[in-house]
Amino acid sequence: MAIDDHSRVGFVQMYPNEQRPSVVAFLEAAVAHYEALGVTIKRLITDNGPAYRSKVFARACQALGIKHTFTRPYRPQTNGKAERFIQTCLREWAYGRIWATSQERTAWLPAFLAYYNARRPHSALGYKPPASRLGGNNLLQINS
């Protein structure tokens, strides 16, 4: 998962694991997603997981022009916005109802993200949705 620090627009894609190829694929997908919204990723904060500390991930960040920093070990509050987004996703999407299967839950993820980004009020944004913080005609505002 990724969250834009300014707008709080969230992005999530499911991968089978947290190994290097998956985290690099996620990074590339996140960059493309945010670029489509007019957001350029300049800095990235991650935890200290082995995939994020790898040379492969460092090269991917460098190739994309992203400055990569790490949270302080054992201090998740260093990345509080991301941690809050994770908790919101768990509470409102993953565990927000009883799903018949994991596949059904995963199939509803795009609808939840569309709601979260374009319609869900956010207290830190004056009870406006994250898309309201994006400039111009972006896809979230056009499709809401």
Predicted regions located by residue number:
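An active-site-proximal beta-strand-loop segment
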Residues: 1-11, 22
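Short small-residue beta-strand/loop micro-motif enriched in glycine and branched aliphatics
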Residues: 9-13, 69-71, 95
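Active-site beta-loop-alpha junctions of metal-dependent nucleic acid enzymes
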Residues: 13-37
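Acidic/histidine-rich, metal-coordinating catalytic segments
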Residues: 18, 36-54, 74, 127-131
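RNase H-like polynucleotidyl transferase catalytic core
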Residues: 43-48, 62-81, 97-102
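C-terminal domain-tail junction helix/linker
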Residues: 64, 88-144
